[in-house]
Amino acid sequence: SDYSFDEHFGKPISSYPPRSVLFDYIQGRVRKSDVRKYIRFNTTTRWVEYNEETKQFKVILDDLVNNRTYTEIFDYLVVATGHFSTPNMPYFEGVQDFPGIIMHAHDFRGADQFKDKDVLLIGSSYSAEDIGVQSYKHGAKSVTISYRSQPLGMDWPEGMKEVPLLEKFEGDLGYFSDGTSQRFDAVVMCTGYQHKFPFLPDELRLKTANCLYPENLYKGLVFNKLPNLLYLGMQDQYYTFNMFDAQAWFARDIMQGKIKLPNEEQRNDDIKLWMELSAANKNHDDEVDFQTDYVKDLIAATNYPSFDLDAVAVLFKQWLKDKDENILEYRDKTYTSVITGTKAEKHHTVWLDEMDDTFERFLSIGPKKEKEVETL
């Protein structure tokens, strides 16, 4: 809430910026906060050990520039590596003999490679939804989404469909659990990620699926068995930057002694309460309300700048509604910022016609001219 898109770009932008634009915004926030001076670059955390007697962490580090391994001692350890970097790659019989493109959504950088191809997406969450419509937009011959438990259930355009889980491949032919089969040119595994912490011993590792409230984390970030070990950003997310900020402020106040933690039993009771609330969620709107209450709970314990979280929740629910109503056109919608009160600008080109996601193109003032389109 302390660095708006309006401030960074000097004007309102549209509500669905591509990754290059988000990256530029993040770089701007890094420059404004001058945080780089606190970061030790070209350094890898090799291993961590906890000393029960001293209540400290021994961290073994590799200096990649000087080819040097060294050790440092810390009172607190904050794990903020995220959980969207280690792809979960399930095995399907015959996949090793599939002759076409196989990738994980983690490595997807553009759907133009799928033009005129039959594309199979395995998984039924945001990645499958997004890569599916991107592939449709860029001219895929067909897009098939294979789900394990339940379909996304969108009103897909002609050429897109959902089928039950893939069972096996025979060459380029995929067989599904409903008895159907189809040939494919490309497969994208939209099968999620693993929480992976190879630098931590087993007893310090967070072990959880992707969920709104990981087990064993008090307030969603304090490792209950060892409260000077903190995990940031390990939840499934509706809120992103604001939630990360709220967690960081909470962690800061713990380390500075401003927040006094209850004992382990009390912390465990609080975890159970939040997990019960999470389990009671019946739909996406419930999940939005749950995470809104969670962020409110964090902010109430610190001096993080307050803002209207209920209004943010309304926007999330409108976004969900807009997607359900038209999966191909919802990105053309604009919303009013809760932080600045300004309404987003409508993008100069409707999403289905926009084939260029570069930073320069996004911030240009108008649609491409006919000759420019012909040269793409």
Placement of each model-derived feature along the sequence:
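FAD-site-proximal beta/loop scaffold in flavoenzymes
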Residues: 101, 107-110, 190-239
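Conserved SAM/SAH-binding loop
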Residues: 42-46, 63-65, 106-109, 165-166, ...
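Feature captures the FAD/FMN-dependent oxidoreductase FAD-binding
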Residues: 5-76, 81
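Short hydrophobic core segments
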Residues: 45, 59, 71-84, 119-122, ...
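Conserved N-terminal glycine-rich FAD pyrophosphate-binding loop of Rossmann-like flavoproteins
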Residues: 1
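Glycine-rich dinucleotide-binding loop and its adjacent helix/turn
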Residues: 18, 22-25, 76-138, 144-145, ...
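C-terminal, flexible cofactor-proximal segment of oxidoreductases
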Residues: 228-376
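A Rossmann-like FAD-binding core segment of flavoenzymes
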Residues: 36, 47, 133-212, 225, ...
